[in-house]
Every structure is written in structure tokens, then in C-alpha cells.
């Protein structure tokens, strides 16, 4: 039984293990199949599927539901809304908007409206061409002209009113103008004139006192200028009539004045002649031949600008104007044109040079077309007689000088009319050399300068320039482009010292003599020599136990500087010796100082090596012999707790101790007032205030703390802090790179240099100088 039971237990175990292994394999296959299905589904999104295959595939509809966000509710404002009411439009604005709309919409797709509009537009342009036939003929105008000039000036109507009447008669039908133009030989009687000009009986009886009212300008009485012309379309219409029927009239203000003063003139007197019709006033009568060109039957201009007449020929031309038959009538007597005379531009062909001495004036002028006559008249105007008389004598005294001028023609678009004043001689002395180039001095010697369009060159000559002979040596070049004004080594004549000292601020010229060689005088001012200061610097090596501070004595010109931090000496233990425990750390360190002082100048030759008696250094320490010291300037000074000097003026090293007793004498209230005056934050206890003041006095020594008032104390502290930071490259680089600085680290760094300042002072310094700080 036992064997069977044992066999049975072994068979069950075997079968159970087989079943377990089969189950695990099936479960693994199932997991693998599920993994493949999920991976295939993920990769189906990247598969390229056709439209046919996509339709056959049973893909489920995917619905995307958007999550609704809760709308943020705005807080309502308790304000009354403004009613959106537009401004009422006026009727004119409504009509304007209606007419400003697109007008072409009326004609779109409607040919009938276009056809109706175009004929009316074409007929509106016809009257412009039809007006040409309504012009007055020459016969009608001649008849109107005769009647117009026979009437007195006060009773005349202007051309504007006549044209207005003509238009009225044309609109009404046939009027008096057509009736009057039928027969030219028939003259109008009083009744015709009364009907023609619409005059009443009073105006017909009293010619002098009556006046007609028409729309004329208020400046009519100043003078009437009338231009009689016809706007003919072609030249053929101008030559249509004969020469005897054409008349041209010029009326001036002078004619109107004489015509008003003549009371004996008859209104209806008229004379006709075959050669030409004339006007009763003889002063205003102009014949046809005077206003017409004899070469061709063409109308010339009536009004033209009169030509310029020179002043010397004005009287002769006025006499000849009366004798000539076809001359133009002058507007008034003694009228001279303001236009400049016609002058040719300067050219290379013909030019005349005039030389006038004292002052010398060189004038280049062009020649008139008439030759010598115009040149003689211009010479009479420009050159006075006194200059002509003295011309020979001055040529002998002064040497002549001719300056070549540029022959380029000068073209000016507009030449202003100027008068030509005379140049009067002056009795002033010659201008010195130093003042020749100043324009103000030239104006004083030359009163007036010619106003002619030709260019003027002014050349002034001084008597200092005469009889100067310059000899050149072999080394000097005879073709030099410049010669000194103040003399050369081989110059025979020397200038007076007055001329030289006017322009050059140099030393006296007594040293320069004619016998010895003289050099060119410099134009720079003479500089006085200044004495320079001689400073001597001594470098000393001092033990760390000796406390030395920077000091400056401006009175005695002494400066003491301390370089860098204290340097520790390296202890070399060769035999593994244990250092003495009694020796202090102060004995192992040292510092370097530099003393600068001023050395008095000595007439004896300078000696770089000086003895102990000549030295004025602060540290009266005997120097070694020259053989022992050599070129070294460093000395080892034994350490001592504190230096004590015999001189009272050199107590700057312990200046804080002097003020400590003065601080202790002050009361707490007085110390608080001092703190407020200095801009410091006051504290409660007196001991704390004394500690702060002691640290500040040690920091800014040798300045006296009690002598500072206001913000001077802060400025002294800030200046000393800035100097210390610039000497330390680490802190200086951090500040320049705007790196945030912890005030605790800055305070510890100052404490390592035996400077004790509070955090409030450091924070105020950083805020004042824009230095970034941090508390972390």
C-alpha cells in the first residue's frame, strides 16, 4: 500500500507540473496575441488606405465632444447706458446726400436717356462760336470814338458801360447802334446823343456840374488810359479796310488833365479830312501815319517801353523829338528810365584798363558799339579832374603795378539799376602792412566804389614797399613761391619795429641788428619758462606689527601710500622643526609703503644719493653706506607696537585717539544731534554711538570728525570706500559686472583690513552708487 500511495503521489505531482507548464505557455501565447493586436491597431493610422477599401472597412464612428468651459461672468456696472440716438439731419444735408450719389446709375442700360442728354450738351457749346459775328466793325467803332472824345470827361461813360448797353440793345432788337452805323458821314445831334447815352435834360444843359452814375472804379479821376482794339480772327480782316479808315489813339493822364481844363471846347465840333481824322485837342492828336508801319500794312504796338537815353544826351534828344515827324510821344517831361544801360559782358576781344593811383583801382570795362564817344563820356564820369592832374606826379613816386584779371565773361541774369558815384580823393596816410587785409580799414580810405556792372579789383600800395632789393645766395632758390614779410638774411632794408610789433607778440627787436644775421620772426607768442617740481620717492618695507595709514600733507608736499595687503612670509621647515609657540603671527608679516616728498632745487649738480641730514622723510631712519646699500631702496624695519614721533605735526597715525576723548565728553543728546546732522541713524546707547564714531574716525583719518558738518562726513566715508574697492581687483570686478553683493561679506572684508563700519553705512553707500546688493 505504501508503494502504491507513493507512486500515486509521484504521478499526481508529475501531472500537476505538466498542466502548470501548459497553462503558462497558453497564457503567454494569449498575451503575445493581445500585444500584437494592440500594436497593429496603433500602426493602422499610418497605413495608406484607398477609398474603396476604406468604404468596405467597418470603422466605427468617432465622435469628438468638446468640453464646455464656463464663461467668465463680468461684473455689471451700475451705469446708465447712453441712448444710441443719431443726430437729426437737416433737409439740405438730406438733399445733398441724395444728389451726391452715383449719377451714372441714371444712364446705365438706358440708351434713350443718353440720347436725350447729348443733344442738349452739344447745343450749349454753340454760343461760344456764334459770338464772333457780334463784334463791332471798324466804321462803327470810329464813329463811337469821335463822339466819345467830344464829350466832357465828367460826362463820359466807360467802355464797360458801353458794352453793357450794346448787349441790352442786341437783346431788345435793332437799336441806335445799327441806325448810327448806316451812314458814317451823318453826325448825331443832341437828341441822338441824349437817347444814345440815356441822359436827362439837366445833364445836357450843365456839362461841368453834371455827372453820370455808372459802375466804374473810384480811381477813374486819376487818369484814363484807353486801348482801342478789335479782336479780329484773321490777318485778312485787319487789312480789309483802307489805310485812311484806320485810326489809333493814345490817351494819357496828362491829356485828360489838359482836356478837363479847356472850357472853350465845343461838344459837337467835328472836322473830317481825307488824309486822316483829327481830334480837336492838339496835344492828344495823333495821325494815322504816326501809328502805322510804312513797310507793310500791319498793326504795330501802340504802347511800348521807351528806350533809355543817357543823361548827357537827354536835352539834345528832347529838342530833336519836336523836329522829327514819326517820333514817339513822351509821356511826360523830364522822365528818365530806371533801367540800366545795355552793356556787353567782359570778353577777351576788346577791353580797356584804367589805372587810378592812391588807392589803385583797376577797372575792366567793355566797349559800347559806338566806339570812342561812349568811352570818353564814361571816363568823364568815373575819373575826377584832380586824379588826372596828380597822375604824372604819383607815377614818378610810386612804381606802377598791373594785376592781370580773369577774362572769363560774367553773366548775370538780373542787374539792379545803380547810380555811378564819383570817387573823391582822400588825404589820409597810407595803410600799414599789418592792416592791409582788413576790409573795414579799406572802407575808411575809399569813400565810394563804382557801381558799374564790370568787376572792380582794389590794389592798395604802401610806401614801405618801395626800393626793396632782395639778394639771393647760391643756396636759395630764385624761383621761390613765397617771401617772408619780415625780412630775409640777405635783405638790404629792414622794416620799422612798429610794423612788426603790430601783428606779432614777440620779444623786443633790439637784439636783431642790421650787421648780424636775422632770422624769421615767429608768430607764436613768447612763453615764459615755468619752474617744475622735483619729487623724490622712497619705498620702505615695514613689519605687520607697525600700523601705517595713507597720509597726505599738501603744505609740506609729503605723501605716504600703502601698497596692497599684508604679505605673510613663508616658513620653510627644513629639519621638521616645530616653530616657537611664543612667537606671534605679526612678526611673520610685512607691508610696503611709499613716501613721496618735494626736493628743493639746488644750484649745485644734482646728486641722487642723499644723506640723513638732507632727508626730510617722515621716518628719520639712518641709511646704510653706499657700498652696503648699492641700488636697493628697501629696508627692513624692526617691529614695534606703535611709532611715536617727536614732531607734533606727524601725529596722523593715531589721530583717532586724539578725538576719542572729545567724543566721551559729549552727552548722549549731543551725540544724537551730531548723528542727525551727519545723516546717520541714531542708536539708543551712548557706548554704541561712540563705537560707531570710533570706527568712522579710524576709517577716514586723518580727517577731523568734529570739523565735518552736514553730509561732508558721508562723502568722506564714500570716497575712502571707493578707493579701497578700486585697489582690490576682486571686489572691483564684481561691482563692474553688476554682480549682487552681500553686505555681510563686504563688512567682513573691511574688518580684515581693520576698518569697522556698520551695515547701515554700507547699505547707504551701495544705494548712492547704484551697486546691486542681496541678502541671500
Curated annotation (Swiss-Prot):
Give the compositionally biased regions (Acidic residues).
201-217
What is the annotated localization of this protein?
Nucleus
Pfam families with a match to the protein in the record: Slx4
| Biological-process GO terms, alphabetical | DNA recombination; DNA repair; DNA replication
> Which GO MF term does the entry hold, naming one?
5'-flap endonuclease activity
Which Gene Ontology cellular component annotation is one that this UniProt entry carries?
Slx1-Slx4 complex
What about PTM? Phosphorylated in response to DNA damage.
Q: What is its main location?
A: nucleus
List keywords of the entry alphabetically: DNA damage, DNA recombination, DNA repair, Nucleus, Phosphoprotein
| Job description of the protein | Regulatory subunit of the SLX1-SLX4 structure-specific endonuclease that resolves DNA secondary structures generated during DNA repair and recombination. Has endonuclease activity towards branched DNA substrates, introducing single-strand cuts in duplex DNA close to junctions with ss-DNA.
Subunit organization: Forms a heterodimer with SLX1.
What family does this belong to? Belongs to the SLX4 family.
Q: Can you name this protein?
A: Structure-specific endonuclease subunit SLX4
